[in-house]
Amino acid sequence: MKRITKLLASHSLKSLMAKKNKRSQQKNKCLKPEKDPSTVKRLLEDPPRKKRYLQPLENPPTESYGDDEKMETEEEGEKYLGKNLPASAFIIVAAERHDSDSYSETELEKKICGSVVVAKMNDDKMVSTDTKKKYFQRILSDDDKIVLLQGMVDFQNDKGTISYDDMTGFIDTVKNIISFQANSRQFTTKIRRLKDKFVQKRNKGVDENSLANVEIYEI
């Protein structure tokens, strides 16, 4: 009998303790996390670590791309062709530099050299053409006009044909007695212009008594 009473008392005590713990847990759920005994215990055992924020990196100094590009272009131009290069050559080299990433170093060197050479040849050709035009436009003096017209008369008397029919033979006849050099096309153009100019002056009555105009008129 005593044993049964003891078991019942023990069972009642356990039931009371279980109910008490259950009430305590429900009460703790209503508390804020920092007031919850279980949360406080966990924080004491494993305190939170302070968060570290990465500092932003300073902006790296910007480089002047245009100045570097210009310096590299000038160095490459001097390296491959030396000095005294035309300005257009450096312009072409600068344009080619924008596609340098897609070429190997050897291919880029060949491409730059080719562009500079072509630009230099074009500039030289333009200068040479302008020089020839200016030279031939200013060489025909009054003495050359007289010699040229007299040579046409002599050639017709000696050969029995006019200079237009045998321009090559006429040039061979007068090339050593005039002060300029020209091909058959230039000779033909000069003779035609000389004729037109003389006819215009004669129609206007411009100084027909001068020595050169008299000799030209007589020829």
Swiss-Prot record:
Segments of skewed composition (Basic and acidic residues): 31-48
Sorted UniProt keywords: Transcription, Transcription regulation
Disulfide bridge map: none
Extent of Acidic residues compositional bias: 65-77
Keyword Repressor: no
Start and end residues of each stretch annotated as Disordered: 9-77
Organism: Arabidopsis thaliana
Family: Belongs to the GeBP family.
Pfam families membership: GeBP-like_DBD (PF04504)
Top-level taxon in the UniProt lineage: Eukaryota
Biased composition (Basic residues): 17-30
Coiled-coil region: none
GO annotation terms (biological process): regulation of DNA-templated transcription
Protein name: Probable transcription factor At1g55950
